[in-house]
Every structure is written in C-alpha cells, then in structure tokens.
C-alpha cells in the first residue's frame, strides 16, 4: 500500500477527529444530507458516525407542487438516503405541497411506491407515519394514479401495521370505500391493530355522510388501543361512540372538526356521550367549528354530556346579520364552565356588541386558562379582562385579542392599549402570555 493511501496517524489528525461520540452525533444531527456526506469524508471515525442509527430515526420529505431543479435534486437525495438508511427509520413524515398537474402526482406516486416498497422490506422499527394534505379528490389525481397510490399505501400498512403506533393521514380527501380500505390494512390478518394515535381529520371528501356507513363503523371497531383520535363530525355516530366505549380504557383525547360543508345534522344521543365519558374517565374532547355559528346547529352538537376541554368558533370573516352569537355565549357555552379550559372565538360581529357576554363567560369558566378572541370589541374590554384577572375572578395564562375596527386610523385605540398595558404591566409580565392589537377591517 502506498503512502498516500495509508491512514493518517493519530498525532497528525485534527482534534476534531477525537470529538466524543455524543458530541459528534449532535454535530451530524444538525447537518443536512449534503453536508453529512461531506463530513463523512473527514476521517474513518466520522465516516462511521454516518451510519449511526440516531441520525436516521426521524425523516421529513417535502415534495413541492411546483418544483425547481434544486428542490427536485434535494427530494431525490432525501429519498435515496431514506432507502439507504431505512432500516433505522422510526418516524417518517411526507409532504406533498399543492401539485398543479397530473405529471407531478404521477411522479409522486411512482416515487412513493418505490420508497414504501423498500421500507417494507428493510425496516422493522417504524413507529409513526404522517402523509398530510394529499387532497386525492382533486382533478390532478387521475383515477389510475390515485388507485395505484392507495394500493401501494395499503400494501405497506399491511406489512408495517402491526408495529405502527401513530398514523396521520389528515387531508387525504378519500371516498368512504377508499378510506376504509387503507385503514383496514392496519388490521390485515388480525381483528385489531396497535395504533394509539390516529388523525383522520379531513380524511374523507366534503359532503360525505360517513356516519351512515356500516363499513366505516366496522373499520373503527378494530382500533382497540386508541389514546388520541382526530376526525370530522360527519364521522360521529352513536355506533362509533359505542365502539369507542368497548376499548375506552386507553382513550384520552378526541379532536372533532365540524365544517359547514360537512354533513352535521345527525342526531347523537347524550346518553352515548355520557356512557363514553364514564368508560373513559380521563377523556377530553376538543371541538373546532368552521363557519358553523348559529345557535341551533351548535346546540345539536355541543351536548352537555360531553367532557369538553376546548372549543374553537371561527367564522372565517363571513358575516351573517341574521345570526347572533349572544345565545351561544349566554346559554350554551356556560354549560361547560366546569370543564372548559381553552376558548377561541373568531367572528365578524359588526352587527352586534358582545363585550359584556364574553366577559361574563370568561369569569364563569373557572378552569379557563386560554382565551383567544378576534372580533369587533371595544378597547375597554381588554382592561375589564385584566381587572378581573387581577381580582382573581378568572385565571387566564394566555390572552390574545385582535380587536376589529371599521376605522382606517387606529392611533387612538393603540394609545389606549399602551396605557392599559402600562397600568397592568406587572400582572401581564408575571402571569400572562399576552398579545393584543387593533386591526382595521375596511
């Protein structure tokens, strides 16, 4: 062997060659793929670190819907490294951002088929899988491309489902049949699966009354180990709650999204929620409403038997002069004053003042620690909340407000807010995560 190919003697090496393994691993952990490959050429020890399982447990691959040459190269590199070090992978996240034509969805489908096939052969450690916002009901997904992707994912979950602990398919937008096909793969050749966290929010397409599907109810009966469940209200039925009751010992959290375009007129019995609350003694339910603001609709959904921890009401800037929030704030939400901990309100109430109703609601909910409000309010509302906090009538830890106004100039309101802040500065800095601004809505 000639001199140039001989290993460098220890006394000739840089001090970086003797960096402790723990420190060296952290250095590599923060490097991107390209820099890692370059660092691996420094010396034998650094090359060996490249094969440390610690570096490859977590992986995120982002596919752009409008890729540049640089981004395409980065994706190819990321996929190559996942295939090479896939045996160490424990947490995989895949993002596909707004594809604009069928060529890109086809390329994504082919890439994912190869990636999932490779992992199913080499990996036995994967604990979590996240593939969000695919929106498979869009026209850019040709039927053949969509079917091929669903088949690849289903085959992968059949092999990996017995070890998978976390699955996030938020925003997939599937038919009931397609969605159940994928979820059924988790319990292939078994009557149950070990998933503890399942996110199927916006998993099904808009306008689907999933709560009427016997297939969906049968599929959900195979989840015996759920701790956390995210889904839409158009999936909720008495039968689903009954299934959850049968395996309720582990259930802790249900996050429910209710969108105006999703069917939400089904009748759920309060006794079904009450039974689930008795079986799952630590259960907390969080509701997220989008453009569902009418009292009659909310009252059908927010039953007093539900152990509600959090409520989010968002109108998304839509205004309905015929819709009043007063009954909701006065009669409905106080029903949950003993359990409600987080409240988010974003609505266009230009036609009615709600300062007094909101203030009374806050001081009546004794466990409320998080309050976020975007609405037409008087600036004095902020001082009333801070005064109540000082007098221990409420126990907020987070207070965020965007005060809408129809005025173009907000100098006067800004000045008043500054005076309020100075007056309660000690309270704010010691007790609150505080953010309040005036926002002009023209």
Swiss-Prot record:
Q: Name one Pfam family in it.
A: F-box-like
Cite the entry's keywords alphabetically.
Answer: Ubl conjugation pathway
Q: Which PROSITE patterns is this protein grouped with?
A: LRR
Quote the InterPro entries the UniProt record gives: F-box-like_dom_sf (IPR036047), F-box_dom (IPR001810), FBXO31/39 (IPR045048), Leu-rich_rpt (IPR001611), LRR_dom_sf (IPR032675)
Q: Where is the F-box domain?
A: 16-61
- For whether the record's keyword set contains Transmembrane, the answer is no
User: GO cellular-component terms in the record?
Assistant: SCF ubiquitin ligase complex
Q: Does Heme count among this protein's keywords? A: no
Highest taxon above the source species: Eukaryota
- Would you kindly state one Gene Ontology biological process term found in this protein's UniProt entry? SCF-dependent proteasomal ubiquitin-dependent protein catabolic process
Q: Which PANTHER family match?
A: F-BOX FAMILY PROTEIN, F-BOX ONLY PROTEIN 39
Description of how the protein assembles with itself and partners? Directly interacts with SKP1 and CUL1.
Q: What does this protein do?
A: Substrate-recognition component of the SCF (SKP1-CUL1-F-box protein)-type E3 ubiquitin ligase complex.
What is the protein's name according to its record?
F-box only protein 39
């Amino acid at each position: 062997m000639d001199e140039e190919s001989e290993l460098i003697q220890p006394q000739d090496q840089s001090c970086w060659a003797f960096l402790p393994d723990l420190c060296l691993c952290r250095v590599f952990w923060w490097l991107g793929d390209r820099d890692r490959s370059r660092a691996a050429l420094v010396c034998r020890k650094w090359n060996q670190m490249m094969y440390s399982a610690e570096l490859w447990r977590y992986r995120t691959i982002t596919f752009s819907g409008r890729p540049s040459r640089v981004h395409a190269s980065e994706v190819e590199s990321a996929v190559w490294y996942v295939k090479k070090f896939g045996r160490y992978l424990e947490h995989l996240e895949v993002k596909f951002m707004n594809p604009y034509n069928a060529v890109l969805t086809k390329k994504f489908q082919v890439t994912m088929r190869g990636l999932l096939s490779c992992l199913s052969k080499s990996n036995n450690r994967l604990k979590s899988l996240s593939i969000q916002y695919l929106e498979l009901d869009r026209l850019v997904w040709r039927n053949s491309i969509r079917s091929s992707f669903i088949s690849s994912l289903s085959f992968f979950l059949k092999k990996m489902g017995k070890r998978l602990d976390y699955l996030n398919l938020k925003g997939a937008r599937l038919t009931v049949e397609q969605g159940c096909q994928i979820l059924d793969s988790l319990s292939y050749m078994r009557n149950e699966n070990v998933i503890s966290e399942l996110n199927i929010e916006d998993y099904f397409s808009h306008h689907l009354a999933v709560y009427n599907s016997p297939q969906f109810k049968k599929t959900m009966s195979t989840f015996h180990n759920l701790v956390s469940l995210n889904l839409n209200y158009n999936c909720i039925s008495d039968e689903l709650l009954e299934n959850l009751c049968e395996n309720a010992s582990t259930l802790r959290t249900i996050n429910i999204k209710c969108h105006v375009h999703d069917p939400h007129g089904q009748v759920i019995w309060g006794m079904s929620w009450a039974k689930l609350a008795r079986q799952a003694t630590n259960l907390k339910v969080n509701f997220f409403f989008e453009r569902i603001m009418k009292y009659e609709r909310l009252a059908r959904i927010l039953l007093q038997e539900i152990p509600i921890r959090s409520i989010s009401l968002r109108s998304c800037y839509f205004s309905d002069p015929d819709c009043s929030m007063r009954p909701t704030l006065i009669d409905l939400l106080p029903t949950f004053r003993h359990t409600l901990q987080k409240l988010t309100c974003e609505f266009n109430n230009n036609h009615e003042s709600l300062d007094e109703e909101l203030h009374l609601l806050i001081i009546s909910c004794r466990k409320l620690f998080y309050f976020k409000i975007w609405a037409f309010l008087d600036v004095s509302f902020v001082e009333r909340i801070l005064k109540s906090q000082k007098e221990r009538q409420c126990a907020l830890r987070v207070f965020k407000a965007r005060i809408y106004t129809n005025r173009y100039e907000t100098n006067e309101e800004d000045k008043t807010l500054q005076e309020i802040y100075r007056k309660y500065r000690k309270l704010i800095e010691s007790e609150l995560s505080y953010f309040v601004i005036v926002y002009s809505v023209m």
